[in-house]
Swiss-Prot record:
This is Large ribosomal subunit protein uL18. GO terms for molecular function: 5S rRNA binding; structural constituent of ribosome. This is one of the proteins that bind and probably mediate the attachment of the 5S RNA into the large ribosomal subunit, where it forms part of the central protuberance. Belongs to the universal ribosomal protein uL18 family.
Amino acid sequence: MAKLSLFERRRQRVRSALRKRSGDKPRLSVHRTGKHIYAQVIDDADGKTLAAASTLGAKGSGANVDAAAKVGKDIAAAAKKAGVTTVVFDRGGFLFHGRVKALADAAREGGLEF
């Protein structure tokens, strides 16, 4: 078995815990890079993306807490438009701090429940 990085081990641990308790709820998946942040609402049963939002194409920096909060509001609005109100939050191996936390808080304020 190949050695996994700390991030990959954390991601596997988070995803396996989500699979056990998510049931049939869609998953709000977050991906963070040095320049941008991405969010998707994914229906794992059908393997389809129901809603998506990111900082791509936005003016200014996409790598700060304010940009992450805007993505959180955008993903909440897109999920509501798709008929989704309850999700399971998938931080994807990233620590729940900073930009990831800002996105989650803004999505909750936007009406998503998790």
